[in-house]
Amino acid sequence: MELKLLQDNGILGAGVQASPEVFEREYNEALVHQVVVAYQANARSGNRAQKDREQVKHTTKKPWRQKGTGRARAGMSSSPLWRGGGRIFPNSPEENFSQKVNKKMYRAGMRSILSQLAREGRLNVIDQFNLDAPKTKVLAEKMKAMGLDSVLIIVDQVSENLYLASRNLHKVAVVEPQHADPLALVQYKKVLVSKAAITKIEELLK
């Protein structure tokens, strides 16, 4: 499998050989969907909470007598039927949203995503990606020169300059191969991978 090399001026150069086992697999849409949804679900923190009828502030006094008023019987104002009453099935921070995806499925999903990106021309290789200074302006100008807007950059080792320069750019993310996730791969318009990172990705996903 040959991946195009993207130069600093935005022109595609000679191809770089990559393993077909990782970058030339059939696209499995159902598997990719499952892996991405599971990744999002496992990232949920469970930060919503509602009160049931035991937790709302209320009096236990009976609102009116049981019989003789013509009104529906009522026991206390915390009833879920009443305004200000508790919820019947309240949301809780202890809810578990996690979804199980085994390693074999996860790796297959990642291979499927990378292969599809390569077919669509959204995945390119770069020689190396270093900055002389931790300046966001320098990185933004480099992205503009390469014709990139929304991009995920995967490098063998993230330098301090590159990390500091990229963290204030909304549509630019820089990660190492072991931290590349399925959501980021499908979320960004373009994926740039350094030559050294290609080797690491192949080792991780074989």
From Swiss-Prot:
One Gene Ontology cellular component: ribonucleoprotein complex
Keyword Cytoplasm applies: no
Listed name of the protein: Large ribosomal subunit protein uL4
UniProt keyword terms in alphabetical order: Ribonucleoprotein, Ribosomal protein, RNA-binding, rRNA-binding
Cited Gene3D superfamilies: 3.40.1370.10
Membership in a protein family: Belongs to the universal ribosomal protein uL4 family.
Described function: One of the primary rRNA binding proteins, this protein initially binds near the 5'-end of the 23S rRNA. It is important during the early stages of 50S assembly. It makes multiple contacts with different domains of the 23S rRNA in the assembled 50S subunit and ribosome.
